[in-house]
Amino acid sequence: MGEKKPEPLDFVKDFQEYLTQQTHHVNMISGSVSGDKEAETLQGAGTEGDQNGLDHPSVEVSLDENSGMLVDGFERTFDGKLKCRYCNYASKGTARLIEHIRIHTGEKPHRCHLCPFASAYERHLEAHMRSHTGEKPYKCELCSFRCSDRSNLSHHRRRKHKMVPIKGTRSSLSSKKMWGVLQKKTSNLGYSRRALINLSPPSMVVHKPDYLNDFTHEIPNIQTEAYESMTKSSQTSGLPRDPQDLMVDNPLNQLSTLAGQLSSLPPENQNERGCSPDVVTCQDEKPFMMQQPATPAVVSSVSASIAQSSSPTSPDPRPAHNQRNYSPVAGPSSDRSAHTSTPSISNSQPSTPAPTLPVQDPQLLHHCQHCDMYFADNILYTIHMGCHGFENPFQCNICGCKCKNKYDFACHFARGQHSQH
């Protein structure tokens, strides 16, 4: 026994030195450093062979392999880890096990010298000190959010960006690199960052959980799938569309298109009038409708008039109407907007074959000749034309205010002061 005794004493001495260093580190932070107490502790650790300075009762060491016990009462598991004496927790390192035991004993040696905060873990104290210094080293790569704790950053990603950490094999690229690749593809396709949300026809709204739950796996394929779906939609519609037109195609514009389709279904009496020999004359004699069924003869005349749109034209004579809630009948450019419709609306008429429209700028389809303004949406064009008066195009159809020119007319609606005269 005389030969085995120095081994546990050396181990106990090393363990006491470790505890002393941890206590000294805490005292350095709190500003209460005492060199005399440290010297006494070190001296007492070298001279005494009992365990007066430790919380654990057992000092004896058994070198028998079948005993399963280590110095200071720590039990080893079958895989060699140190097991907690209070629960089933096991750890390979002694320092980690000591931190875990402090949960059971309630010891909190790491204290803040600026406030009453205390913790059993040194990393918790470091994170707490950032609240005093204002340091925020953790930054979200998707927005400008910064925080002082990593757990707050993870909570921000789940709550704000609907990002769930993926367990298992990680992808070869990090999330920051994935975002860079996505933005590069977006810039090459000519879209802005807004296109990440409005890129899924026909609903045009992609909910974030659909593509951000598996952020690092799914995002590189979003742009390609969306681009293929846009290509298919442009091929099936019969009219080539620009990417910017798809950006404008939000759910509000889709509702406007649906309203245009419903308004394009005329009553039976209008069908009888539309089937008269002089179709163009009949439509010129009644107020502007949101959408009218167009015949191939009308479409051919419209395509011929579009080629001559650069030359100034005089407006057609307007019929005399005393009602204000109707839009005026515009000139040739207005006829183009009245007779030319989107392919989905023109195909909804079973009696007339779908004409193939020539490739042209969609903005030229809705033109106000009075204000010299172009509208890509027929609903907005109809609302705008309803603001013009019949007898005087620069007379407000809401309050009856007479304006001098198109600039005065635009300023009147910009101010929004419609007082009834």
From Swiss-Prot:
Residues 229-238, 339-351 have a biased composition (Polar residues). The keyword Amino-acid biosynthesis does not apply. 'Pegasus' was the winged horse in Greek mythology. Transcriptional repressor that binds the core 5'GNNTGTNG-3' DNA consensus sequence. A zinc finger (C2H2-type) spans 82-104, 110-132, 138-161, 366-388, 394-418. PROSITE patterns: ZINC_FINGER_C2H2_1 (PS00028), ZINC_FINGER_C2H2_2 (PS50157). This is Zinc finger protein Pegasus. It is found in: Nucleus. Probably self-associates.
